[in-house]
Amino acid sequence: MSIRLGVNIDHIATLREARAIYEPDPLEAVFIAKNAGAHQITFHLREDRRHIHDSDVKRIIQSSPLPINIECALDEKIIDYLCGLKPQRITLVPEKREEITTEGGLDIESRYDSIRDTLKAFESCGIVSALFIDPKKESIFLARELGAQAVELHTGRYANLMLMAYSNLSRTHRALEEFAFPTQEINEEISRTLDDIAQCAKLATSTIDTRPLECFAGHGLNYQNVGAIAQIPQISELNIGHSIIARSVFVGLERAIIQMREAMCQK
């Protein structure tokens, strides 16, 4: 399997914070992930430190046998802190304190100057830069223009459509009303959304006029919906967290990661 799996360990820390004690330790998850065949560790250092803390970041970077990809907002203090630690990659993401999880891609146009300056800072520190974006062609062009080295395509819309179409979510109090389409319409929307992701991945990695970007994908991916995304040849990496950690409660973290790698191979 050529596509890589980055395991997001945010919710290991979420479980720890539920009791405000010292376990489970996110660092321990790093070594389990390596043994299970993960290719990378991903986590989000949020402004409110709701799960991962600064001390976690430092310990994990210093001790991890796997490459580290840190997600963060355009926050000057966080950027300075991370540049001092020099992880392999930093992925810039949008952030709202009131959100449960990241709700969409970066608004590159409105933050153009800040993103440009931040990417230059990453480059000077030898840190690979990525932008978390919605699968829109204009965002790909802007990412190229800014000098990003990679993009991660936000798969949340696809994931939510799949949940509403093929799970019991639509019959619960968690139903996503904005995705409550009739059966035929929701399947057509899934197909369109997948095509948007595939076309953006192809555009990102093309060599026309300028250097290609590496293309990753993530958000809301689970064991049922990951196969179609993993089959897009231009996507070289998936970053997945919640579904792996949720399954690990029942089967253990190592087995949950192995099962995800197997699901990524299913067409």
Swiss-Prot record:
It comes from Helicobacter hepaticus (strain ATCC 51449 / 3B1). Catalyzes the complicated ring closure reaction between the two acyclic compounds 1-deoxy-D-xylulose-5-phosphate (DXP) and 3-amino-2-oxopropyl phosphate (1-amino-acetone-3-phosphate or AAP) to form pyridoxine 5'-phosphate (PNP) and inorganic phosphate. Pfam families: PdxJ (PF03740). This is Pyridoxine 5'-phosphate synthase. SUPFAM superfamilies: Pyridoxine 5'-phosphate synthase (SSF63892). Its main location: cytoplasm. Belongs to the PNP synthase family. The active site is at residues 44, 71, 219. Pathway: Cofactor biosynthesis; pyridoxine 5'-phosphate biosynthesis; pyridoxine 5'-phosphate from D-erythrose 4-phosphate: step 5/5. GO terms for molecular function: pyridoxine 5'-phosphate synthase activity. Its EC number is 2.6.99.2. The record marks 152 as: Transition state stabilizer. The keyword Transferase applies. It is an enzyme of class 2 (transferase). 1-deoxy-D-xylulose 5-phosphate binds at residues 10-11, 46, 51, 101. Homooctamer; tetramer of dimers. CDD domains: PNPsynthase (cd00003). It is found in: Cytoplasm. The keyword Cytoplasm applies. The lineage of its organism: Bacteria, Pseudomonadati, Campylobacterota, Epsilonproteobacteria, Campylobacterales. It comes from the Bacteria. Keywords: Cytoplasm, Pyridoxine biosynthesis, Transferase. One of its GO terms (biological process) is pyridoxine biosynthetic process. One of its GO terms (cellular component) is cytosol. 3-amino-2-oxopropyl phosphate binds at residues 8, 19, 220, 241-242. It catalyses: 3-amino-2-oxopropyl phosphate + 1-deoxy-D-xylulose 5-phosphate = pyridoxine 5'-phosphate + phosphate + 2 H2O + H(+).
